[in-house]
Amino acid sequence: MDYKELANLIFPDAKDISYYEEKYPERDLPEGAIVTRFAPSPTGFVHIGGLYQSLIARKLASQTNGVFFLRVEDTDQKREVENAVSGIVSSLKDFAIEPDEGMISEEEGKGNYGPYKQSQRKEIYQAYAKYLIEQGKAYPCFCTPEDVEEIRAKQEAAKIRPGYYGVCNIMVISFQKDLNQRALSM
C-alpha cells in the first residue's frame, strides 16, 4: 500500500485540494495588506485578553488595507455555552471592533471565505489532510486520549521532554512493510 492508497482509505470522499483553491482564491488585496483573525471559543464571555487581541488584529488589518475576520473555534462542543457567539459579536461591537467578515450572529456569517465556524470546515481540513498523507507528510494516529496521557506521564516520570514522537507513523510504516512482504511471498 502506498501513501495515496492510505489517504483514499481514510478519506474516500474528500475533494481534491484544487477544488478549495479555486473556491477560495488568493484575496485581491494591496501589497503588504495583512489578513488577521480573532478565533474565540464560544465557552463564555470575551475576556480582556480576547478584546486586546481582536483590537490589535483589527488595527493591523485596517492600517494595511487588509481584512479582519471572526472565525469561531467551536470544536469543544462539550463546553460550548448557549448564545455565546452572539455574546462575542456583541462584546466586540461594544468596543467598536467590527470584523470585515466572519460571524455576525449566532448562525450567520458574512464574506466569501466561510464557513466561519470551525466545526463547519471539516471537509476542507479533510481534503488537506488527505493531500498531506498522499505526500507522506502526515499519517493516521490510532492513539486514544488515554494512550497519549500515558505516554506523557511516562515521559514526565523519566524527565523527558513531553511530546508525541511519531508512534503511529512507525506503525503505518511497519504495517506497510508487512503488507509488502506478504505480497512478495505470494
Where are each of the predicted segments found?
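Active-site cores that bind ATP or allylic diphosphates and position pyrophosphate for catalysis
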Residues: 139-186
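N-terminal Rossmann-like or analogous alpha/beta NTP/dinucleotide-binding catalytic cores
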Residues: 2-156
